[in-house]
C-alpha cells in the first residue's frame, strides 16, 4: 500500500512538474505590425462623370463619303474633377481604352449591335479639337488647376469608307495618370 501511495504521489508530482514546465515554455507574448499609407490624391473624379453617356448629334452619311473624312460636328466630352491639389501633383495624362477601328486605327470602332452604320468610327480629340487621341494610348500632358475643373475632350464621326446610315456606338474606359 505504501508503494501504491508513493507511486501515486510521484505520478502526481511528475505530472504537475510537466504542466508547470510546459507553461514556462508556452509563447504568451507576440507583436502585430500594421502597415498602411495615407495618400493625398491629386483630384477626385466627380461621380456623374465616371460612367457618363455622351449623345452625339445625327449626321448625314453624305458628310462621311471617303476614308478619313470627319463630319466636322465635334461633341464635347466633359470629365469633371474636384478637389484638385497641385501641391500633390500638377500634371495628368489620360488613357482611353477601347476597340480601335481596323481602318482608322486612331479612332474607336463602331460597336453598335443592331442597325449599325457601316464605314464609320468615332475619333476622340484633345480639347484643341485637332490632336487625335488614339485608343489605348496615353494623351499628352494636361496641366491641372487647384480646386474643381472640367477637362473637355472632343469626339467626331470619322469615315472609314463610304458611310451608310445606322447606329454608331463605342465604349471607352479611361484611366487618369497623375504625375
Swiss-Prot record:
It comes from the Bacteria. Disulfide bonds: none annotated. Disruption phenotype: Mutants show significant reduction in adherence to several cultured epithelial cells (HEp-2, HT-29 and MDBK). Its main location: other. GO terms for cellular component: pilus. It is found in: Fimbrium. Induction: Induced in the presence of epithelial cells. InterPro entries: Adhesion_dom_fimbrial (IPR000259), Adhesion_dom_fimbrial_sf (IPR036937), Adhesion_dom_sf (IPR008966), Bact_Fimbrial_Adh_Pro (IPR050263). Pfam families: Fimbrial. SUPFAM superfamilies: Bacterial adhesins (SSF49401). The keyword Signal applies. GO terms for biological process: cell adhesion involved in single-species biofilm formation. Keywords: Fimbrium, Signal. Residues 1-21 form the signal peptide. Part of the elfADCG fimbrial operon, which could be required for adherence to host epithelial cells. ElfA is an accessory colonization factor that contributes to adherence of bacteria to human intestinal epithelial cells and to animal intestinal tissue in vitro. Binds specifically to laminin, but not to fibronectin or collagen type IV. Belongs to the fimbrial protein family. This is Laminin-binding fimbrial subunit ElfA. It comes from Escherichia coli O157:H7. The gene is elfA.
